[in-house]
Amino acid sequence: MGKRAVTELERKHLVETDRHIAECKNYIAKQRELIERAIQRGRSTEVAETTLEALEESLGAFEGRRRSLLDRLKERER
């Protein structure tokens, strides 16, 4: 695979990663709302909070992947 093809593939991965980040942020916002409603209703939030932590970890992983892709793309542009 040539340099140009690799760069195109990395750009596609970057677009996909950006989509995953946006989706993950949306899920996190919804999960926080769910936790808030549970608190207001006096319900347990343990499972919801564990889910939120997992979503936040996923977001961190996606953001790390994005930084890595951007670094590689910058290197290829030199």
Region spans (language model):
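Anionic, Ser/Thr-rich low-complexity intrinsically disordered regions
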Residues: 1-78
